[in-house]
């Protein structure tokens, strides 16, 4: 959900001013931590691509070299897209998201994360920056750490693997 509490998975939204500042700050942190980024790959969603561009500017990385990959999109929330989440959470559990009409299920997202992981490890570059989304990011972490995708249904697991906006998570 976005800062307004709306399910925004595949819905195109713009970065807020705060999101822009977070992206710039992430770029500055990365420049100190990993001064050499060989490649930036991001979700093709507008908010993610804009985040990647802001980070790239801070790194001095050419924006025209950012690769968009549809495997990195956020989980699709089906009929919940664009709706406020508070009402859903008052009557449902996280596992119920798999039953929302037209929503991507956790097993489907896990398969996509596996494909994304295979794509990323086959890139012939040392330092690849991936700019993606929270739910999908957790799925990718589970692939790398070999944690079963069913853990996404566990509230504590989601808290333990929560990814904040513009947060740096080093995987490999």
Task: Cite the ranges covered by each PLM segment.
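Catalytic metal-binding/acid-base residues of hydrolase active sites
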Residues: 46, 72-73, 135
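Short glycine-rich phosphate-binding loop at a beta-alpha junction
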Residues: 36-44, 67-68, 127-131
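Acidic, low-complexity terminal tails and accessory targeting/binding regions
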Residues: 26, 57, 61-63, 67-68, ...
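Active-site-proximal alpha-helix that buttresses catalytic centers in soluble enzyme cores
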Residues: 1-61
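Phosphate-handling substructures
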Residues: 14, 55-115
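His/acidic metal-ligating clusters that form di-metal
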Residues: 115, 120-123, 130-135
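GST superfamily/GST-like fold recognition
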Residues: 134-138, 167
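Glycine-rich phosphate-binding loop signature in dinucleotide/nucleotide-binding domains
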Residues: 33-36, 120-126
């Amino acid at each position: 959900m976005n800062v307004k509490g709306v399910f925004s998975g595949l819905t195109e939204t713009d970065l807020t001013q705060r999101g822009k500042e977070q992206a710039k700050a992430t770029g500055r942190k990365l420049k100190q931590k990993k001064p050499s980024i060989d490649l930036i790959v991001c979700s093709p969603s507008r908010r993610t691509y804009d985040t990647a561009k802001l980070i790239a500017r801070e790194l001095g990385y050419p924006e025209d070299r950012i690769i968009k990959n549809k495997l990195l999109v956020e989980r699709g929330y089906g009929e919940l897209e664009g709706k406020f989440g508070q009402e859903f959470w008052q009557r449902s559990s996280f596992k119920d998201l798999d039953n929302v009409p037209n929503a991507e299920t956790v097993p489907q997202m896990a398969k996509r994360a596996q494909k994304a992981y295979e794509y990323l490890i086959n890139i012939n570059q040392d330092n690849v920056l991936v700019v993606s989304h929270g739910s999908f990011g957790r799925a990718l972490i589970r692939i790398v750490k070999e944690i079963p995708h069913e853990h996404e249904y566990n509230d504590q697991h989601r808290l333990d693997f929560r990814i904040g906006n513009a947060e740096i998570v080093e995987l490999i």
